[in-house]
């Protein structure tokens, strides 16, 4: 079994926040791949289904971001999972809006949700870092992540979530390259081929003159008419 965790804060007031893009990612997977209804478990909401041959549990911790590790740890212990079975979708200030990167293990880079998961299960789990951009100054970060995505962000956000859903099966079986390709195809669709120039029609040739059947005497007479 794989555990896909989407980080965010519970409640309608936070639903459209940049900080909740992890929730949005797992919700898109659930909707597009026929997962079961969301149920309250492990201090969060879970939905079960399959991605290809892999059984997958989607988890949205409802502990609020800073305590996400409590929910993740509880689910892992119940299913006897290791950090290698876990992939966490989270917002990433250090990536431009719409950019996506995979990471296995490593530090939490100051992200409070990841910090909590580190404290409960260690750092060896996988992450899908979802770029939301940076407000430009560290003092503006809290307000920035707890505000909704702007209208101008909606197109790339929709494409990113569709790409994540497209590539979810590849991600579940460990094919990170194919997952990233699926996202890239949504974010940068192939350019339409330029129409080939129409072949030139062959130029019409002037009809050949009919041979002159007049006798030499008739030709001479015609000159003096």
Curated annotation (Swiss-Prot):
TRNA binds at residues 14, 64, 66, 112. Its main location: cytoplasm. It comes from the Bacteria. It is found in: Cytoplasm. The keyword RNA-binding applies. One of its GO terms (molecular function) is tRNA binding. GO terms for biological process: protein quality control for misfolded or incompletely synthesized proteins; rescue of stalled ribosome. The record marks 91 as: Stabilizes the basic form of H active site to accept a proton. Keywords: Cytoplasm, Hydrolase, RNA-binding, tRNA-binding. The active site is at 19 (proton acceptor). It is an enzyme of class 3 (hydrolase). It holds the Pfam family Pept_tRNA_hydro. Hydrolyzes ribosome-free peptidyl-tRNAs (with 1 or more amino acids incorporated), which drop off the ribosome during protein synthesis, or as a result of ribosome stalling. Belongs to the PTH family. This is Peptidyl-tRNA hydrolase. The gene is pth.
